[in-house]
From Swiss-Prot:
It comes from Carboxydothermus hydrogenoformans (strain ATCC BAA-161 / DSM 6008 / Z-2901). The gene is metK. L-methionine binds at residues 56, 99, 250, 281. This is S-adenosylmethionine synthase. GO terms for biological process: one-carbon metabolic process; S-adenosylmethionine biosynthetic process. Mg(2+) binds at residue 17.
Length: 396
């Protein structure tokens, strides 16, 4: 079999782009908690001493956005000005409009309902909030049915935050990045080739101490021992110093970590970000649905790995296309898989919202460490409750 290397990265909750994602989703959750029917498209920018929250929000409730912003920043760990950012003293500017009535026209009553193909009751009168294509992916190379490189990179990033917040490594600060290179023998992951960890730190700690502690307290508890060998390479803060970080080191924007949020580059991406968007936005809800479909198909044993593309037109409820690719691992024909998908999954926006119960404040917890393959939180699109019926109908 051919040997190949594949690399994926993750970032911690203190990374500037992830601060922005978490603020956008914290605002979304605060609104959905009071008004499940709200329309939210919330974008955030963070830089030294400043948070800017912009977007289109249509809701019947009131949310104190600056308060939500400050609470989120404090939870992440930016609580002192010497960290380069402080949730209590940073400026918060908001500029919020209502959703465009032209967009609302297409979303409120889907085109099929207007043309009489279906009743409002059947589709709950929600068309797609935008055109676009979304991808879902699953593979049986890990128990959570995710690609191993992104799965391990997320675990390292989450562990970095754990040892910082528990003060096991009290000199760590919130910003950080991880990267994992996995060696494959054909399609099977066999070892970890390279690990990169960059973490913000107190100025008075030595590079040698950081390297020793990160390998001992972050890498070893997280990466399975059988994947590491004497040839595995470790790069810990390879520039030698990472004191200035967070929004002081780099500006951050919502939606700038879409590959970290999904499959680490192993699958294709339609380009739409998730955070700050209510579930009528198919960028988010249809990507979740595509993952749900893909995971259930792999869990059913119909394929070892699968990529699914869904595509939508604004104001139209039914997907304009559904594509599957099993990379030669399918036990039945791809066309038959598409038939099963159409039969067992309602992929109209209203159907997705109902199927996955998406009008709830569940989004902030997804805004760091990945939206898929999460084993630390219960997400509806990660359930495999349709695997058995799919297996039976596939004749396996």
């Amino acid at each position: 079999m051919t040997r190949r290397l594949f690399t994926s990265e993750s970032v911690t909750e203190g990374h500037p782009d992830k601060i922005a994602d978490q603020i956008s989703d914290a605002v979304l959750d605060a609104i959905l908690a009071q008004d499940p029917q709200a329309r939210v498209a919330c974008e955030t920018a963070v830089t030294t001493g400043l948070v800017l929250v912009i977007g289109e929000i249509t809701t019947s409730c009131y949310v104190d956005i600056p308060k939500v912003v400050r609470e989120t920043i404090r939870e992440i760990g930016y609580t002192r000005a010497k960290y380069g950012f402080d949730g209590d003293t940073c400026a918060v500017i908001t500029s919020i409009d209502e959703q465009s009535p032209d967009i609302a026209l297409g979303v409120n009553r889907a085109l099929e309902a207007k043309t009489g193909e279906m009743t409002d009751d059947e589709i709950e009168a929600i068309g797609a909030g935008d055109q676009g294509m979304m991808f879902g992916y699953a593979t049986n190379e890990t128990p959570e049915l995710m690609p191993m490189p992104i799965s391990l990179a997320h675990r390292l990033a989450r562990r970095l935050a754990e040892v910082r917040k528990s003060r096991l490594l009290p000199y760590l600060r919130p910003d950080g990045k991880t990267q994992v290179t996995v060696e494959y023998d054909g399609d099977k992951p066999v070892r970890v080739d390279t690990i990169v960890v960059s973490t913000q730190h107190h100025p008075d700690v030595s590079q040698e101490e950081i390297r020793k502690d990160i390998i001992e307290h972050v890498v070893k508890p997280v990466i399975p021992e059988h994947l590491l060998d004497e040839n595995t390479r470790y790069f810990v803060n390879p520039t030698g110093r990472f004191v200035i970080g967070g929004p002081q080191g780099d500006a951050g924007l919502t939606g700038r970590k879409i590959i970290v949020d999904t499959y680490g580059g192993m699958a294709r991406h339609g380009g739409g970000a998730f955070s700050g968007k209510d579930p009528t936005k198919v960028d988010r809800s249809a990507a979740y649905a595509a993952r749900y479909v893909a995971k259930n198909i792999v869990a059913a044993g119909i394929a070892d790995k699968i990529e699914i593309q869904l595509a939508y037109a604004i104001g139209v409820a039914k997907p304009v296309s559904i594509m599957v690719d099993t990379f030669g691992t399918g036990k039945i024909a791809d066309e038959k898989i598409v038939e099963l998908i159409k039969k067992h999954f309602d992929l109209r926006p209203a159907g997705i919202i109902r199927m996955l119960d998406l009008r709830r404040p569940i989004y902030k917890q997804t805004a760091a460490y990945g939206h898929f393959g999460r084993t630390d939180i219960d997400l509806p699109w990660e359930r495999i409750d349709k695997a058995e019926i799919l297996r039976m109908e596939a004749g396996l």
